[in-house]
Amino acid sequence: MGANSSSISELPDNEYLKKLSGAEPISENDPFWNQLLSFSFTTPTNSADLKLLEEATVSVCKSLVEKNPRTGNLGSLIKVFLSRTKELKISAECQNHLFIWQAHNALFIICCLLKVFISRMSEEELQLHFTYEDKTPGSYGTECEDLIEELLCCLIQLIVEIPLLDITYSISLEAVTTLIVFLSCQLFHKEILRESLIHKYLMRGRCLPYTSRLVKTLLYNFIRQERSPPPGSHVFQQQTDGGGLLYGIASGVATGLWTVFTLGGVGSKATPQLDQCSPLANQSLLLLLVLANLTDAPDTPNPYRQAIMSFKNTQDSSAFSSSHPHVFQINFNSLYTALCEQQKSDQATLLLYMLLHQNGNVRTYVLARTDIENLVLPILEILYHVEERNSHHVYMALIILLILTEDDGFNRSIHEVILKNITWYAERVLTEISLGSLLILVVIRTIQYNMTRTRDKYLHTNCLAALANMSAQFRSLHQYAAQRIISLFSLLSKKHNKVLEQATQSLRGSLDSNDSPLPDYAQDLNVIEEVIRMMLEIINSCLTNSLHHNPNLVYALLYKRDLFEQFRTHPSFQDIMQNIDLVISFFSSRLEHAGAELSVERVLEIIKQGAVALPKDRLRKFPELKFKYVEEEQPEEFFIPYVWSLVYNAAVALYWNPRDIQLFTMDSG
């Protein structure tokens, strides 16, 4: 590096990097370090520059891998960085730009080297490079482990203790990035790592006491969304003489958004590059998700997950429980606001899911909010644009709704919140609709999309479970929401008839031919009948619990009464059809007595009058529909690849060669 580097492409020939990776040991006190660390640059963020930087770093690393066991220069560089960080807090308070600048540059080089080392060697090999012992070969173990632990601990201290100012923003970001890089060994393993060396250091020993402070700081970084300092307030001034590391590189390198690779199993579309004006917030959230999803050690639960599960509101004055060792307090109002504002990203939705599912304090607070629409509307928008989202993002949004609908208070309150002009809902102009009716519309639309495209049973199940949880509390359903409920049933009915016909034809064909195996129409029929049963239970639940609140649903039911005829005598639906049949018969009779040519308004009036007169004791009682979200066994098999796919796609200034990734599959098509 040094003051004379002018472009990434020149890095392999840079005299300072050649010396660092050369055959000559460099002591920690050598003036060389001041020369190496005196460079000015803007960290690259586009794909072309990042790929160039990676390739240049690989070239330097090859030499360093070969020579470092004899020179110990990597260890010396790390010790130089460690010695400089001891005075960082004072430097920040005293506005010592030069000191912070050089400390940042040291960490940037360490991070670049580490990223290549970790992608190309085992943890055992990595350990060997963290020490140099000239006297007694084989005695490296303790010292190298201590140096790794010391660096990890130093990075955590830097994140939690250094005040976030314009001059410290970049080094704080680099510290978060380096911790992500330390944990990135998972990317290069197909199986989930359960006993990683780095995990061990982060979960016990010197790092452990910082657990709650680290989680709290990362959360506050996400909450505050601090923007990257503007050029000019930054410690790294761009040199006007062309001496800056990346000066003039745009003329020789094609720039543009990072080409994001589609992840098999993570989505069918590439995730768009997100607005990276708050890189520290983005990177902090990604690190938090990685830490929270580390697997438990055999004898120790993941302390970062414990901290996520147990933190409390700053307004909560109750004593900390001794059963939660990593409790801290955070401003829930600020957290709620940030969660509402950031739901366009997968990682913010995943954080919301984790907090609602794992932290009872957060869940209770969210459900008590009187502005719940600020949280629910962004989630509904994710589901509405299902074709633009990867499947994991849709699942997380859906499970969040399912968790919320487990609460009766939520199911009541959403029908009291009236919304005006939902501009993103394109199928129909909705000038005024309750949040509850909009939620029903979006969930039904998701089911219909799934029926025609992905045919994912898991998605169906969660959509229907959310509707079922809400059904007893349906209130004043919008006429369009009521129509869509019955339209969905109509679609299911047609699908049932089609599958039934295919099954019948298949059975006839099997009697005439013994050749190829036939499609399993019986299983298809079973699945569609399960979904129909669930829809009938949802309609029945609304009719038995809140018929008088929902004239529009009764109207839609009567308008399409012929749909239900075929299911009256079906053995799978006879019991649940009794109430629906009774309601249809009761109101049909009243409408017939009222005469022909009735207006919509008159029909609704008759329905409202009839709802009061309908003898409730004639409606058969069924168990209340209640579904609870339960995380599957070994959730890490889902969440760890998902989290790392988010890191791969959304991390700022981090590039990994897609050919090296083992944890998830790449699909460029």
Curated annotation (Swiss-Prot):
**What does the UniProt entry say about where the protein is found?**
Cytoplasm; Golgi apparatus
Q: One GO BP annotation here?
A: Golgi organization
Positions with an attached lipid (N-myristoyl glycine) read 2
Keyword Cytoplasm recorded? yes
The alphabetized UniProt keywords are: Cytoplasm, Golgi apparatus, Lipoprotein, Myristate
On the tree of life, the source organism's domain of life is Eukaryota
What's a GO cellular component annotated to this UniProt protein?
Golgi apparatus
How does it get modified post-translation? Myristoylated in vitro; myristoylation is not essential for protein targeting to Golgi compartment.
Segments crossing the lipid bilayer: none
Pfam families membership:
Dymeclin
Checking PANTHER family in the record gives:
DYMECLIN
Function description: Necessary for correct organization of Golgi apparatus.
Concerning its family, UniProt says: Belongs to the dymeclin family.
What name goes with this protein? Dymeclin
Q: Which organism is it from?
A: Gallus gallus
